[in-house]
Amino acid sequence: MSLPFTVIICIVLLSAILISIVIFGNSPNFRNTPIYKLRLKILRWNHDIIAWINYVDSHVFGNKLVFYSGWLVPLFYIIVVSFCLHQFFTKVYKLLPLFVRKSGFHSTYIAFTILCIFIDTFMATFSNPGKITTGNVDKVDNFFQNNELIFFADNYCSTCEIIKPARSKHCSICNNCIMLFDHHCIWVNNCVGYYNYKWFMGFLIANINLLGYGGYLCYQAMSSTKTEFPTLSYWKTIISTNDSNKATGVLLILCVIFIMIAVLFTGLHLRYLYLGVTTNECDKWSEVEYLISLGSLYQVIDSNLNEKYVEKCVIMNHDNDSYETVFISLKNENVLFSSNDGINLRKIESMEDDLINIYDHGFVDNLKERMFNRVLN
């Protein structure tokens, strides 16, 4: 096996492993495992690198470096896809069996697949995710209700200098508050929010189609050319015959590895749709679940307090060096009252039985809300 081919395979495998750890390492099934800890280290390294880049950018490049560097990943993605397509048409296509090359269906579907990947990438990259401005903030604020558990009334974005509606979040990369914020996608250098979630899902599905159909065509090409080397295994045919077979093998391996990641990631988002949460909200609900596991989350019953839920914690009373049980606000962590104040509380024992996600309207309606949304501004 030649060194370049070895390097390519190692890079592909390492990239797939790292991407999988970052995407799925935060799953409850991986908590307190080496995978979860490695994910934290990767994110910490990423945070330190970004902090260093921001420092250099602000002191040397006048805050322009971060803006332009955000386009490196989308540019890399487009270059890789374009290069792979070039390799396919110059080295793989001629190896395809005649029933594929002479088929009007396959010719049309190849064109359709390429068209979809570039259109969905363009739309996911450049469409408005749902930027909140002074002109539309009132409409957005009235669209989603605060549940006083993960979203709170009268929250204020100090950067945008506007109120922060429920289900929104300020993106430090885009420097905008985004309606129904899901996450910032580095692959398209854009936030995924209320208006462009449909294009993001289209981007994922287009990639699954490209990888799945591309893998099928590469397998057909390998099966066709394998007849010329009956004494060699598929692996030997890939690494020791000619450049066309090597390119076909590399593309097939890429498709097999990355379609699994794309399918799992798309399945994760379908699960979020089923649960009626966004990626951002899933993290918030995880914090709520953690409080429940500690026995620290309580619902306020029959009180004049402007709080629906509070967190129990123990603090030290420095006046007499004793410890005191108090209840703090989930919104700002201010101490609201102590256990001796006689406030009527109900302990939250279970996420499923004691809490209601007011944003979950059922899978079909959740899907309609994200895919067929109405324009507010």
UniProtKB/Swiss-Prot annotation:
Record gene name: SWF1
Lumenal-facing ranges: 1-4, 86-103, 220-249
Sequence ranges on the Cytoplasmic membrane side: 26-64, 125-198, 271-377
Alphabetical list of PANTHER family matching this protein: PALMITOYLTRANSFERASE SWF1, ZINC FINGER DHHC DOMAIN CONTAINING PROTEIN
Function: Palmitoyltransferase that targets several endosomal SNAREs. Palmitoylates the SNAREs at cysteine residues close to the cytoplasmic end of their transmembrane domain. May have a role in the cellular quality control of transmembrane domain-containing proteins.
DHHC domain residues: 155-205
TM stretches of this protein: 5-25, 65-85, 104-124, 199-219, 250-270
Topology versus the membrane: Multi-pass membrane protein
Similarity annotation: Belongs to the DHHC palmitoyltransferase family. SWF1 subfamily.
Any Pfam family: DHHC
InterPro entries cross-referenced by the UniProt entry: Palmitoyltrfase_DHHC, PFA4/ZDH16/20/ERF2-like
Catalytic activity: L-cysteinyl-[protein] + hexadecanoyl-CoA = S-hexadecanoyl-L-cysteinyl-[protein] + CoA
Protein name in the entry: Palmitoyltransferase SWF1
GO molecular function: protein-cysteine S-palmitoyltransferase activity
Principal place of residence: endoplasmic reticulum
GO biological process per UniProt: protein targeting to membrane
Enzyme superclass (EC): transferase
EC number: 2.3.1.225
GO cellular component labels: endoplasmic reticulum membrane; Golgi apparatus
Keywords of the record: Acyltransferase, Endoplasmic reticulum, Lipoprotein, Membrane, Palmitate, Transferase, Transmembrane, Transmembrane helix
Free-text note regarding domains: The DHHC domain is required for palmitoyltransferase activity.
UniProt subcellular location: Endoplasmic reticulum membrane
